[in-house]
Amino acid sequence: MLDPKFLRNELEVTAERLATRGFILDIAHLTQLEEKRKSLQVATEELQASRNAISKSIGQAKARGEDVEAIMAQVGDLGSQLDAKKIELAAVLEEVNAIAMSMPNLPDESAPIGADETENVEVRRWGTPRTFDFPIKDHIDLGEGLNGLDFKNAVKITGSRFIVMKGQVARLNRAIGQFMLDLHTTEHGYTEAYVPLLVNEASLLGTGQLPKFGEDLFHTKPATEEGQGLSLIPTAEVPLTNLVRDSIVDEDELPIKLTAHTACFRSEAGSYGKDTRGLIRQHQFDKVEMVQIVKPEDSMAALEALTGHAETVLQRLGLPYRTVILCTGDMGFGSSKTYDIEVWLPAQNTYREISSCSNMKDFQARRMQARYRVKADNKPALLHTLNGSGLAVGRTLVAILENYQNADGSITIPEVLRPYMGGLTQIG
């Protein structure tokens, strides 16, 4: 959520910056609402003051033995007018808030301006794609050949975009997640967390999935008088970041660095016809998430570090990748600056996204009222939040199967994963 004061004082600047993201802000309508808000605020305060003043005169009139019926009627009339103005004001504030909640974050000045993914800017590459001396297979054929990927039974049990993994492929998938967690906790300074896979509406509002992206979620329980609705998490970013919702943390506690390995659930409502085969785009998938909660002045350096942590996973696995900075038109809703890391997939002869690392600045913190107490003046200030995949486990499995395949369909196990595989050097 954007800073309301900045929005009011710098409306045209805000509109210009949001336009680079493809979001058109109706300046005239917002200006009209702001003028109406001010007018109603003044009217409400004046009515309140008048009612209070006249109410005080009732006691004085009674003390003098005067009839107060007319004064009581006047107070009642002012009360009715006040209630009506309060209802009008609440409606205006609700509309302003709805508009504010629909606005994406302002892009950082260092983010390249562009309309879509074709205008993202590559910043570096690592590794050289392998040259094969035999016809290569994609991860689907490789996984099925190893009797490790069972799409048919997944469809029978649940439906499309799900997977059953078995045997050494399932073990390899587990090993990948364990390796990532161990790396982040022992070398990168993250604390491992185990979090709920179901979250309430307040949590999804806090991190920005609601109200705009409700159709992308799997909702399991509707809201009732007894409580909020529950939805399956689309990413562990939601529960991890919400750990500081409605909190004021001490400055000495920062930075807070958390990681979790969870299943994630997405309806892929806007992805009809994309990646319909294989593991690239599933309704349920595993991901190791990294979250950092930092002081505002530290967030840009934290983004570089967090992106480096995700890249280190690929380097240790020996998987070629490239890192791109997303242009304004391709960034996620809550992001001010994002790096995407794309791993090389030989069967597709291209790089595909395997991690997205973003600095949200105070966008989520304002929605969550997540603050820290500044030691210098002992006053609370909004935190900055960052998140990134470290990495998507299923896509990492895809990359390993394809990059480490052998002519006979077997898969060489990357060296760093062998301790997690009981010392195996290959499967198949």
From Swiss-Prot:
Catalyzes the attachment of serine to tRNA(Ser). Is also able to aminoacylate tRNA(Sec) with serine, to form the misacylated tRNA L-seryl-tRNA(Sec), which will be further converted into selenocysteinyl-tRNA(Sec). This is Serine--tRNA ligase. Pathway: Aminoacyl-tRNA biosynthesis; selenocysteinyl-tRNA(Sec) biosynthesis; L-seryl-tRNA(Sec) from L-serine and tRNA(Sec): step 1/1. Signal peptide: none annotated. The keyword Nucleotide-binding applies. It holds the Pfam family tRNA-synt_2b. InterPro entries: aa-tRNA-synt_IIb (IPR002314), aa-tRNA-synth_II (IPR006195), aa-tRNA-synth_II/BPL/LPL (IPR045864), Ser-tRNA-ligase_type_1 (IPR002317), Ser-tRNA-synth_1_N (IPR015866), SerRS_1_N_sf (IPR042103), SerRS_core (IPR033729), tRNA-bd_arm (IPR010978). GO terms for biological process: selenocysteine biosynthetic process; seryl-tRNA aminoacylation. GO terms for molecular function: ATP binding; serine-tRNA ligase activity. Homodimer. The tRNA molecule binds across the dimer. CDD domains: SerRS_core. L-serine binds at T235, A236, E237, E289, S389. Its EC number is 6.1.1.11. It comes from the Bacteria. Its main location: cytoplasm. It is found in: Cytoplasm. The keyword Aminoacyl-tRNA synthetase applies. SUPFAM superfamilies: Class II aaRS and biotin synthetases, tRNA-binding arm. ATP binds at R266, S267, E268, E353, I354, S355, S356. Gene3D superfamilies: Bira Bifunctional Protein, Domain 2, Serine-tRNA synthetase, tRNA binding domain. It catalyses: tRNA(Ser) + L-serine + ATP = L-seryl-tRNA(Ser) + AMP + diphosphate + H(+); tRNA(Sec) + L-serine + ATP = L-seryl-tRNA(Sec) + AMP + diphosphate + H(+). GO terms for cellular component: cytoplasm. Keywords: Aminoacyl-tRNA synthetase, ATP-binding, Cytoplasm, Ligase, Nucleotide-binding, Protein biosynthesis.
